[in-house]
From Swiss-Prot:
<keyword id="KW-0699">rRNA-binding</keyword>
<keyword id="KW-0689">Ribosomal protein</keyword>
<keyword id="KW-0687">Ribonucleoprotein</keyword>
<dbReference type="GO" id="GO:0019843">
    <property type="term" value="F:rRNA binding"/>
</dbReference>
<dbReference type="Pfam" id="PF00453">
    <property type="entry name" value="Ribosomal_L20"/>
</dbReference>
<dbReference type="GO" id="GO:0000027">
    <property type="term" value="P:ribosomal large subunit assembly"/>
</dbReference>
<protein>
    <recommendedName>
        <fullName>Large ribosomal subunit protein bL20</fullName>
    </recommendedName>
</protein>
<keyword id="KW-0694">RNA-binding</keyword>
<dbReference type="GO" id="GO:0003735">
    <property type="term" value="F:structural constituent of ribosome"/>
</dbReference>
<dbReference type="InterPro" id="IPR049946">
    <property type="entry name" value="RIBOSOMAL_L20_CS"/>
</dbReference>
<dbReference type="GO" id="GO:1990904">
    <property type="term" value="C:ribonucleoprotein complex"/>
</dbReference>
<dbReference type="GO" id="GO:0005840">
    <property type="term" value="C:ribosome"/>
</dbReference>
<comment type="similarity">
    <text>Belongs to the bacterial ribosomal protein bL20 family.</text>
</comment>
<dbReference type="InterPro" id="IPR005813">
    <property type="entry name" value="Ribosomal_bL20"/>
</dbReference>
<dbReference type="GO" id="GO:0006412">
    <property type="term" value="P:translation"/>
</dbReference>
<dbReference type="InterPro" id="IPR035566">
    <property type="entry name" value="Ribosomal_protein_bL20_C"/>
</dbReference>
<comment type="function">
    <text>Binds directly to 23S ribosomal RNA and is necessary for the in vitro assembly process of the 50S ribosomal subunit. It is not involved in the protein synthesizing functions of that subunit.</text>
</comment>
Length: 121
């Protein structure tokens, strides 16, 4: 009886791993056993860092808003509180973009937040 090796599927599977290991250094790019473990590790880091990226961007937006709001004599937390009191529902990404690309518009938003804070006190 003919021996079934599954060679086509095996070759395809190995080639896929080696293709993903392109750019790795040393044996990691050419030997299937090292490549497989390196690719799995890289994929795990990739997954983790895709999740981390969301928080990284949020931190960046908050830092930008803190700088922009302090120009208008508000802290970041008082700016956000004032916006909530004024019923202005802009997210941090949008506020950050406004602060960078349209400082006059951000000044108006900050003034509305200040007025709302003064009204609540």
């Amino acid at each position: 009886m003919v021996r079934a090796t599954g060679s086509v599927a095996s070759r395809r599977r190995r080639k896929r791993i080696l293709k993903q290991a392109k750019g790795f250094w040393g044996d990691r790019k050419g030997h299937i056993r090292q490549s497989r473990s390196s690719v799995m590790r890289a994929m795990a880091f990739n997954y983790m860092h895709r999740k981390d990226r969301k928080g990284d961007f949020r931190s960046l937006w908050i830092a930008r808003l803190n700088v922009a709001s302090r120009i208008h004599s508000l802290s970041y937390s008082r700016l956000i509180n004032g916006l909530k009191c004024a019923n202005i529902s802009l997210n941090r990404k949008m506020l950050s973009e406004i602060a960078i690309h349209n400082p006059e518009g951000f000044a108006e938003i900050a003034n509305q937040a200040k007025k709302a804070l003064e009204a609540t006190v």
